[in-house]
C-alpha cells in the first residue's frame, strides 16, 4: 500500500492547497497535474476539505473586521447623560443628606412669602366653611400626641397630609423601629400667637418617637426632602414644617370656570360646563378674534367635587365673569389699541375686558381646525417657573 492510499488526508490537503493557489501557477502546467487535480476534485473528501479551508479564511477576515469596528466605533460616540428611572423603578441612588443646624430654615426666606408657604388665608374654626377642607390623618406609622383629646392634631390640609405621610416613610427607613411623632397640627385653642399656619391646618411640629434630640437635625432634612414648603429647626425640642394652601396650589396652576358657567352650543342652546360632553360643539375664538364653533375633544382639568376659590368680575352692563384667580382674561387697552391677557385677580377697576356681544352670530357655520391634543401640557406647566419671567407667572 503506497503512502497516498494510507494517508488520504495528506493527499486531500495538498490538492486543496494546489486548488487555492492555482492562480500562482503558470499556464504551462503539465497535463498530469491537471488530471490529478481534476480527479481529486471529484472526490467528496476533497470537496469537504476545500470548503473548510474557505470557511476558515472567511471567519478569519470577519473576526478581524469585527475587532476593527469595536476599536473604531467607541471613538465616534460622545458621552451623554440620560434620564434616570421614574418613581418605583429600581432602587433610589443613595445621596449624602446633611442635617440642619439649630435655627436654620429652608428656604432661607420668610415663611409667608410666595416662594415658601405663602401668605395667611385666615383662621379655620370648626364652624368655618373651610373646616370641611381639613382631612384627618390615620396613618399607623405616625404617632399623634393629641393632648386635647379632641383629635385636632390629626386634622390638616390635604397637602400637609401628603407630605407628612412621605416623611413618616422616610423616618422608618432612616431609623428602623422609630416612628414620626406629631406634637401639634391644626390648633383651635390659639396657643401659637396671632399669626400661625397652625390655625389653617397647614403647619405641624414634629419629633421622633424616642425623643432623641440628636436625630432632629436629620429629621428636618428629611422633612425638606419630603416636600414641605418651609422647614425650620426652630427648637431643640421639635421641628416646625408648613406647606402652601391647597387652593393656591390648584388655582395658581390651572385656569378654570365654575361648573355653573355656561357655554353656547352650535344649536344655540346654552349648556352648563358641568354638563358638557365629549363631542359637543361650543363657541370659541380663533387667534385673530373670530368666533368659531369647536368640538370638545378632551377635559384637561375637570373636578366637579373640588372646592375652589373664584374671582368675580362685574361690568357696568351687568355681566358677571366667575373664574379662578389664574384664569387669563382678554383685556382691551384703549390708549394703545391693543388686546392683552391678564390674570383674573390682577384686573383693576375701570379695566375693559372682552365679552361676547349678544347680538353677534358667533361665526355662523364656520368650523375650527383641530390641531390635536397637546399631551405635553403638564410638562410645560412644570418648567414654567424656570423659563418664564416673573411678570408672566401667577404666583
From Swiss-Prot:
**What family name appears in the similarity comment?**
Belongs to the hedgehog family.
Q: Where is the composition biased (Low complexity)?
A: 26-43
Q: Does the keyword Nucleus apply?
A: yes
Propeptide residues, chain positions: 27-82
Annotated localization: Nucleus; Cytoplasm
The entry lists its GO molecular-function terms as:
calcium ion binding; cholesterol-protein transferase activity; morphogen activity; patched binding; peptidase activity
Residues of the site described as Involved in auto-cleavage: 324
Name the residues that bind Ca(2+) 1.
147-148, 153, 183-184
What the entry lists under Pfam families is as follows: HH_signal, Hint
Q: Where is this site: Essential for auto-cleavage?
A: 327
Which residues does the UniProt site feature Involved in cholesterol transfer point to?
301
Q: Where is the lipid attached (Cholesterol glycine ester)?
A: 255
Residues covered by region (Disordered): 26-46
One GO BP: Bolwig's organ morphogenesis
Q: Where is this site: Cleavage?
A: 255-256
Q: How does it assemble?
A: Interacts with shf.
Enzyme Commission number(s) from the entry: 3.1.-.-
Q: What is the scientific name of the source organism? A: Drosophila simulans
Instruction: Cite the entry's keywords alphabetically.
Output: Autocatalytic cleavage, Calcium, Cell membrane, Cytoplasm, Developmental protein, Hydrolase, Lipoprotein, Membrane, Metal-binding, Morphogen, Nucleus, Palmitate, Protease, Segmentation polarity protein, Signal, Transferase
Please tell me where Ca(2+) 2 binds in this chain.
148, 184, 187, 189
Q: Which residues form the signal peptide?
A: 1-26
Chief site of localization: nucleus
- Its name, as the record gives it, is Protein hedgehog
**GO CC entries:** endocytic vesicle; endosome; extracellular space; nucleus; plasma membrane
**Where is a lipid covalently linked (N-palmitoyl cysteine)?**
83
Amino acid at each position: 500500500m503506497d503512502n497516498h492510499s494510507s494517508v488520504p488526508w495528506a493527499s486531500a490537503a495538498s490538492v486543496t492547497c494546489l486548488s487555492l493557489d492555482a492562480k500562482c501557477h503558470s499556464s504551462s502546467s503539465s497535463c498530469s497535474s491537471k488530471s490529478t487535480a481534476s480527479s481529486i476534485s471529484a472526490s467528496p473528501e476533497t470537496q469537504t476539505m476545500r470548503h473548510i479551508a474557505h470557511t476558515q479564511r472567511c471567519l478569519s477576515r470577519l473576526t478581524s473586521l469585527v475587532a476593527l469596528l469595536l476599536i473604531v466605533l467607541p471613538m465616534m460616540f460622545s458621552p451623554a447623560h440620560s434620564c434616570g428611572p421614574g418613581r418605583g423603578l429600581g432602587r433610589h441612588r443613595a445621596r449624602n443628606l446633611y442635617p440642619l443646624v439649630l435655627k436654620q430654615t429652608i428656604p432661607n426666606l420668610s415663611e409667608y412669602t410666595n416662594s415658601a408657604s405663602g401668605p395667611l388665608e385666615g383662621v379655620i374654626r370648626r364652624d368655618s366653611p373651610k373646616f370641611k377642607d381639613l382631612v384627618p390623618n390615620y396613618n399607623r406609622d405616625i404617632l399623634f400626641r393629641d393632648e386635647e383629646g379632641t383629635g385636632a392634631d390629626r386634622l390638616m390640609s390635604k397637602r400637609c397630609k401628603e407630605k407628612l405621610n412621605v416623611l413618616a416613610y422616610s423616618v422608618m427607613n432612616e431609623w428602623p423601629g422609630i416612628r414620626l411623632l406629631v406634637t401639634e397640627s391644626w390648633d383651635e385653642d390659639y396657643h401659637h400667637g396671632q399669626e400661625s399656619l397652625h390655625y389653617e391646618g397647614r403647619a405641624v411640629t414634629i419629633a421622633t418617637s424616642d425623643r432623641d434630640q440628636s436625630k432632629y437635625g436629620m429629621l428636618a432634612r428629611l422633612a425638606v426632602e419630603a416636600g414641605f414648603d418651609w422647614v425650620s429647626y426652630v427648637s431643640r425640642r421639635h421641628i416646625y414644617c408648613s406647606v402652601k394652601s391647597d387652593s393656591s396650589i390648584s388655582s395658581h396652576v390651572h385656569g378654570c370656570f365654575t361648573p355653573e358657567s355656561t357655554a353656547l352650543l352650535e344649536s344655540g342652546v346654552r349648556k352648563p360646563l358641568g354638563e358638557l360632553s365629549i363631542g359637543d360643539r361650543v363657541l370659541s375664538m380663533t387667534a385673530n378674534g373670530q368666533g368659531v364653533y369647536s368640538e370638545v375633544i378632551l377635559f384637561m382639568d375637570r373636578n366637579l367635587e373640588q372646592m375652589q376659590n373664584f374671582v368675580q368680575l362685574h361690568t357696568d352692563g351687568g355681566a358677571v365673569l366667575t373664574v379662578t384667580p389664574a384664569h387669563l382674561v382678554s383685556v382691551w387697552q384703549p390708549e394703545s389699541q391693543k388686546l392683552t391677557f391678564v390674570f383674573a385677580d390682577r384686573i383693576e377697576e375701570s379695566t375693559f375686558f372682552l365679552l361676547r356681544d349678544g347680538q353677534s352670530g358667533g361665526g355662523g357655520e364656520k368650523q375650527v381646525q383641530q390641531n390635536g391634543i397637546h399631551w405635553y401640557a403638564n410638562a410645560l406647566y412644570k418648567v414654567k417657573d424656570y423659563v418664564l419671567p416673573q411678570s408672566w407667572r401667577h404666583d
